């Protein structure tokens, strides 16, 4: 298994640090030849429009779309989850490049601005009974799940904050900003 972390923008360093802590040496993916070397890819939080545009500039949108969910497991956190969604609400004017690989509808910045960021416990039975610490920074919200896409994580109010579709995983929160590595370990099993 070879794990890559998309390193164009956002908090890729934090994901790399967690992977190293659990014994995995990641490849920082910035170019198509690096993407071709990995079978697991983390798309980090950051700014989804910027990451999408950089994926287009560096000609990685189509290779990721082609391989995503087949021979490439993908996990998108926050902005990465937006990029994975096949429907994005509240896009910037003019739209934004996305991968559209997961059958889910997501709303950008659903909880408000940077000042409205928060932490809350997450129920995620797929990784264990103990609640997961959730860090939400300008977080999107999963509004609807389509065929083949299942909810795997919830806030106390029932809001879906994690979804899985085969080898694709989307989280609207930032596990890489906590000391809990269970979601990273789950991703490695996809």
From Swiss-Prot:
GO CC, one annotated term: glutaminase complex
Record flagged with keyword Hydrolase: yes
Record's keyword terms, sorted: Glutamine amidotransferase, Hydrolase, Lyase, Pyridoxal phosphate
InterPro entries per record: Class_I_gatase-like, PdxT/SNO
Binding site for L-glutamine: 46-48, 108, 137-138
A matching Pfam family: SNO
Domain of life: Bacteria
Catalytic activity: aldehydo-D-ribose 5-phosphate + D-glyceraldehyde 3-phosphate + L-glutamine = pyridoxal 5'-phosphate + L-glutamate + phosphate + 3 H2O + H(+); L-glutamine + H2O = L-glutamate + NH4(+)
Active-site feature positions: 78, 174, 176
GO molecular function, one term: pyridoxal 5'-phosphate synthase (glutamine hydrolysing) activity
UniProt entry tagged with the keyword Cell membrane: no
UniProt pathway: Cofactor biosynthesis; pyridoxal 5'-phosphate biosynthesis
Coiled-coil residue windows: none
Disulfide bonds: none
Gene3D superfamilies recorded: 3.40.50.880
Listed EC numbers: 4.3.3.6, 3.5.1.2
NCBIfam families (alphabetical): PLP_synth_Pdx2 (TIGR03800)
Subunit structure: In the presence of PdxS, forms a dodecamer of heterodimers. Only shows activity in the heterodimer.
HAMAP family registered for this protein in UniProt: PdxT
Function text: Catalyzes the hydrolysis of glutamine to glutamate and ammonia as part of the biosynthesis of pyridoxal 5'-phosphate. The resulting ammonia molecule is channeled to the active site of PdxS.
Family note: Belongs to the glutaminase PdxT/SNO family.
Protein name (record): Pyridoxal 5'-phosphate synthase subunit PdxT
Organism the protein comes from: Chloroflexus aggregans (strain MD-66 / DSM 9485)
Lineage summary: Bacteria, Bacillati, Chloroflexota, Chloroflexia, Chloroflexales
């Amino acid at each position: 298994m070879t794990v890559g972390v998309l390193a164009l923008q956002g908090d890729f360093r934090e994901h790399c640090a967690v992977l190293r802590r659990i014994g995995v040496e990641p490849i920082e993916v910035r170019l198509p030849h690096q993407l071709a070397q990995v079978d697991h890819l983390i798309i980090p939080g950051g700014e989804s429009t910027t990451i999408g545009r950089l994926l287009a500039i560096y000609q990685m949108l189509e290779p990721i779309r082609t391989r995503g969910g087949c021979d490439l497991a993908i996990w998108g956190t926050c902005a990465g989850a937006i990029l994975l969604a096949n429907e994005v609400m509240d896009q910037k004017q003019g739209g934004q490049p996305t991968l559209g690989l997961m059958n889910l509808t997501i709303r950008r910045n659903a909880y408000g601005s940077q000042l409205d960021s928060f932490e809350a416990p997450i129920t995620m039975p797929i990784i264990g009974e103990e609640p997961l610490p959730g860090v939400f920074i300008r977080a999107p919200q999963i509004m609807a799940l389509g065929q083949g896409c299942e909810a795997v994580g919830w806030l106390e109010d029932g809001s879906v904050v994690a979804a899985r579709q085969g080898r694709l995983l989307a989280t609207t929160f930032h596990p890489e900003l906590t000391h809990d590595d269970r979601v990273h370990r789950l991703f490695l099993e996809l």
